[in-house]
C-alpha cells in the first residue's frame, strides 16, 4: 500500500478519475537549503503517482527504479475549507447555497452517525502483560516476515522470542513505573479529539483500537457496531506510514471488514499518514522552539531527530515509503523553524533496531557517539515518529541515549516531549477528520507537485490492494539462490541461524523432547 497523507487546509484536491499511462515522475519541490548533518550516504528520493488496479491514486514511491502511471486530473484552485461556499443542497423545491460553517457541517453530518477510529500500537499496562504483549507483537507477520514455507512457525517462534526477551523488557517497563502509559495517553487524545470535533459542530464518537494489546482493534470495532456508526474515519496515530505500523493495523482491519456484513456496508475512509499537515508541523516546531530556550546557548544546539527504525528490506524490497516520508517530515519542520528565525543544524537517525538484520541507517546510538567525537556539546532529541510517551521515549531515549550522550562527551542534553494532547495538534487532527468526511466512500486525488497528497484515501481494501499490486511490480532481487532464497533474504533471516532454529523446532515438535519442552514453551501449543 502506498501511503498518502491528507491535504492540509491549503491543499488542492478534487475528486478525480485515475487512468494508467506512460511513466511519469512529477517534479519534487526543490529541497530547502538545509543544515542537516548527514552522517550516512546521500539519498535520491523520487515522488511518483501510482495507480493500482483499484483505480486509486496513492502517494510517494521510494526506490531507485520504478515505473509509474500518469493521473489525468482536474485540479481545484481552492482549498477544501472554502468548498462550503460552493456546495449546493438540491431539493424538489429549491436550491440553497451553503454560506456558513454551520451549514457546511450540517451537510457533512446529516443523519449519519460518525465515528473516528484511532489506531495505535498498544503497550503492556503491568509487568505481567509484557510477555503476552511481546508474543502478539512478534506473531504479526508484518513484524517478523518468515519465508512462505515456514509461516506455520510464526506463533512458535513468537512464543520463543517473547519468553527470551520478556525479562529484559520487564526491567525497562519497571524503570518507567511498571507499565506503558500509551493507553492512558491515547484515551486522553481520543477524548480531546472528540471535544475538538464537537466544538466544530461534528458530533462524532472517537474509538481507540490497539494492535497488540487492550483495547484491541477487534474490541473497538465491536463497540462501533453496537453504536450503529454509519460513517467511519480510520486515523492511525502514526504521522508517517510504514508497513509495520499503519500497514499492519490496516491489514488487520481489512480482514475484519471483509468478514463482517455490517462493516462491508458501512462507509469509511482511511488517512494512512499525515506528516505534512500544517498543524502537525507547527505543533512540532513549537515544542522544539520551547525546549531550545532551556539551553544556555540555544543557537549552538544540534537538533537530533530520532525515529523508530524499520528493516532496510521493507524500504528497498517491499516499497515502504516510511524513510522518504520521514526525511520530508524533518525538512518541513526545519522549514517552519527557519521561518521563526531558528537555523540550528539537525540530523536524523533511527532507533530501536533488534536482531542481526540491517535496519535503516544511521542508527541513533552510533550517531550519538559520532556526534560526540565531532565535538557536539549540546543535543536536543526529538522523538519524531511518536505522538505519545511510551517506553521508547521514557526509557530508551531519556535513559539509555542520554547516558550514551554524556559518555560520548555531549555535555548538555534535552528532549522534546511527545505531542500528547497539545492543542494545535489535536485541532489539526480534528480538521483532518472533517476534511475527509465529504469523501467517505469516494476517491480523491491531490497535487503531488504541491506536496498536497490525497485526502481521503479510499477504503481499507482499496488501499491494501493498491499497495500489494505495486509491491508485486517491484523489480526482483539481482541474485537468487538455487533453492529460492535471495541474498537479501539471507541477510534478512540469517540463513544459517534460521535453518538451525527451524531444525531444532522440528525435532522438538516431532520428538516431544528438548529444551523448549523443558522450559514449558512448546507444550503451550498442544
Swiss-Prot record:
CDD domains: Ferrochelatase_C, Ferrochelatase_N. GO terms for biological process: heme biosynthetic process. It is found in: Plastid, Chloroplast. Coiled coil: none annotated. Its main location: plastid. Pathway: Porphyrin-containing compound metabolism; protoheme biosynthesis; protoheme from protoporphyrin-IX: step 1/1. GO terms for cellular component: chloroplast; mitochondrion. It holds the Pfam family Ferrochelatase. GO terms for molecular function: ferrochelatase activity. It catalyses: heme b + 2 H(+) = protoporphyrin IX + Fe(2+). Its EC number is 4.98.1.1. It is an enzyme of class 4 (lyase). Keywords: Chloroplast, Heme biosynthesis, Iron, Lyase, Plastid, Porphyrin biosynthesis, Transit peptide. Gene3D superfamilies: 3.40.50.1400, Chlorophyll a/b binding protein domain. Belongs to the ferrochelatase family. Catalyzes the ferrous insertion into protoporphyrin IX. This is Ferrochelatase-2, chloroplastic. It comes from Oryza sativa subsp. indica (Rice).
Amino acid at each position: 500500500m502506498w501511503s498518502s497523507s491528507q491535504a492540509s487546509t491549503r491543499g488542492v484536491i478534487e475528486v478525480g478519475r485515475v487512468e494508467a499511462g506512460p511513466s511519469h515522475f512529477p517534479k519534487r519541490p526543490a529541497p530547502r537549503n538545509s543544515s542537516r548533518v548527514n552522517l550516512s550516504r546521500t539519498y535520491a528520493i523520487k515522488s511518483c503517482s501510482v495507480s493500482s488496479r483499484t483505480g486509486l491514486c496513492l502517494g510517494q514511491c521510494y526506490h531507485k527504479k520504478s515505473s509509474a502511471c500518469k493521473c489525468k486530473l482536474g485540479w481545484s484552485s481552492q482549498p477544501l475549507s472554502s468548498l462550503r461556499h460552493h456546495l449546493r443542497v438540491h431539493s424538489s423545491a429549491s436550491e440553497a447555497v451553503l454560506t456558513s460553517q454551520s451549514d457546511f457541517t450540517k451537510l457533512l453530518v446529516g443523519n449519519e452517525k460518525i465515528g473516528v477510529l484511532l489506531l495505535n500500537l498498544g503497550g503492556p499496562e503491568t509487568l505481567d502483560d509484557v510477555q503476552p504483549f511481546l508474543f502478539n507483537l512478534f506473531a504479526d507477520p508484518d513484524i517478523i516476515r518468515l519465508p512462505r514455507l515456514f509461516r506455520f512457525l510464526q506463533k512458535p517462534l513468537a512464543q520463543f522470542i517473547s519468553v527470551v526477551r520478556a525479562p529484559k523488557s520487564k526491567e525497562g517497563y519497571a524503570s518507567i513505573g511498571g507499565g506503558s502509559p500509551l493507553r492512558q495517553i491515547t484515551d486522553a487524545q481520543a477524548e480531546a479529539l472528540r471535544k475538538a470535533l464537537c466544538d466544530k459542530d461534528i458530533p462524532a464518537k472517537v474509538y481507540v483500537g490497539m494492535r497488540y494489546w487492550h483495547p484491541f482493534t477487534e474490541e473497538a470495532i465491536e463497540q462501533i457496531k453496537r453504536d450503529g456508526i454509519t460513517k467511519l474515519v480510520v486515523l492511525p496515530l502514526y504521522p508517517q506510514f510504514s508497513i509495520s505500523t499503519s500497514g499492519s493495523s490496516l491489514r488487520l482491519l481489512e480482514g475484519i471488514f471483509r468478514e463482517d456484513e455490517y462493516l462491508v456496508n458501512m462507509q469509511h475512509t482511511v488517512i494512512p499518514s499525515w506528516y505534512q499537515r500544517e498543524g502537525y508541523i507547527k505543533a512540532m516546531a513549537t515544542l522544539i522552539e520551547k525546549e531550545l530556550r532551556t539551553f544556555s546557548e540555544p543557537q549552538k544546539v544540534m537538533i537530533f531527530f530520532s525515529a523508530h527504525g524499520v528493516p532496510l528490506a521493507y524500504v528497498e524490497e517491499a516499497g515502504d515509503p516510511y524513510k522518504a516520508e520521514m526525511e520530508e517530515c524533518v525538512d518541513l519542520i526545519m522549514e517552519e523553524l527557519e521561518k521563526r528565525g531558528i537555523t540550528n543544524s539537525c540530523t536524523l537517525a533511527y532507533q530501536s533496531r533488534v536482531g542481526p538484520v540491517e535496519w535503516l541507517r544511521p542508527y541513533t546510538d552510533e550517531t550519538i557517539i559520532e556526534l560526540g567525537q565531532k565535538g557536539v556539546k549540546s543535543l536536543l532529541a526529538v522523538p519524531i515518529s511518536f505522538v505519545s510517551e511510551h517506553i521508547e521515549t521514557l526509557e530508551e531515549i531519556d535513559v539509555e541515549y542520554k547516558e550514551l550522550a554524556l559518555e560520548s562527551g555531549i555535555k548538555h542534553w534535552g528532549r522534546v516531549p511527545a505531542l500528547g494532547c497539545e492543542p494545535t495538534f489535536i485541532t489539526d487532527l480534528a480538521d483532518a477528520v472533517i476534511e475527509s468526511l465529504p469523501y467517505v466512500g469516494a476517491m480523491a486525488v491531490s497535487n503531488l507537485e504541491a506536496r498536497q497528497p490525497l485526502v481521503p484515501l479510499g477504503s481499507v481494501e482499496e488501499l491494501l490492494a493498491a499497495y500489494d499490486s505495486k509491491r508485486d511490480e517491484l523489480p526482483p532481487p539481482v541474485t537468487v539462490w538455487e533453492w529460492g532464497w535471495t541474498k537479501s533474504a539471507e541477510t534478512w533471516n540469517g540463513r544459517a541461524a534460521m535453518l538451525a532454529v527451524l531444525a531444532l523446532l522440528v525435532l522438538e515438535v516431532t520428538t516431544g523432547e528438548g529444551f523448549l519442552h523443558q522450559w514449558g514453551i512448546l507444550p503451550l501449543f498442544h
